[in-house]
Amino acid sequence: MLSKNEWDPLNTVIVGIADNAMRPPITNSLRTVNYANIIDTGAIEVGHYPAQVIEEANQDLEILCDFFRKENIKVLRPESNNPQYYNYCPRDTVLIHDNLILATPTALAERRSEWTSFQKHLDQVTIAPTPNNATLYNIDCIRNSNILALNEIDPCFDAANIIRANDDLYYLVSNTGNKKGAEYLRSLGKTVHTIENVYSYIHIDSTIAFLREGLMLLNPKRITNVKEQLPESLHNWDIIWAPDPIDIGYYPNICNASVWININLLSINPNLVVLEEHQHNLRIELEKYGIESAMLPMRHARTLGGCFHCVTLDLIRNHI
C-alpha cells in the first residue's frame, strides 16, 4: 500500500540527488516565492551550485541510502539529468497518499517537470492542472511579509506543504501553497485541514513533524498557541517542543533554509527517526518518548534547502 502517514514502518523510499543542481535566472516565480524579502536581487548568484556543495551533498545522500539498505528498505533514485532547478528534494513535487500519486502544481514554475526524473518509479500518476503563470504571482508580496506570493486564482502548491496522518491531510497556506490548492485536494476526495498564519515562507516540515499517531514535534518559534493556530483535530495530540537547533551553517552566501532543520527529520518507524548528526538536544527529547535517532550527516541541508524529510519521498510504508 502507498504511504498514507509519516510514521508507519518504511518499506520503499525515493532519495534525491544533487547532480547539476541549479539556481535559475530570476523570474517572477522566483522573485515572489524565494526572494520576496530581498531588496537587491542583483546580488543573487545564478547558475550551478559550487562543485563542493554538489559533491558533499551526494556523499551524504549515499550515506543515507546505505543506512536505508541496512534497514532492509528499498531505495530508488531519480535519473541524473539537467534540471531547471534540482532533483535534490523529491518530497517537494509529488504527494503520496493512500491511493493517490499526485504531481503537484508547484509554486516555482521552474520545478513543474522535476518529478519526471523519478517518474519511472511511479504508477498511475495524477498530474494536477498547471497554473497560469501570468496571473499566479502577487508582486505586492515583495518586501511585504504580510502578503503571500500566490494569488487565489488557480490551485498551486508544493507537495511539501502537506503532512499526512492517515485519512487527514494537513496543508500549510504559504508562499508555496494557496487556499485553492487545498480546495483542489478536497475535489479529489481528500480530507484537508488548512493551517494559516503560522509560517509564510515555504513548507510545513520545518514547523510540524508527526512522529506517530497522537504525537507531534512542533517548532516553538512558530507555534505559540496550539488551539488558535492548529486544527481542532490536533488539539489532543501530545507535543514535543523542539529545542533550539544546532546551526550547521551553509556555504558562503547561499542559504535556502532556516536553522530549524532538526524538525525536518524522517521517521523510519514509530520508534526510529533519521536526525541530522549535530542535533543531540532533540535526540535526548525524543528518547524520552521511546524514539531512537540515527544520527547522520546532511552538511548542505541549509545550502540546498532540505534535510532528511525533504530529500526523501516515502513511497510505501507497511501500515500497522
Annotate each predicted stretch with a short phrase:
Residues M1-I320:
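The feature marks the mature, well-folded catalytic cores of soluble enzymes
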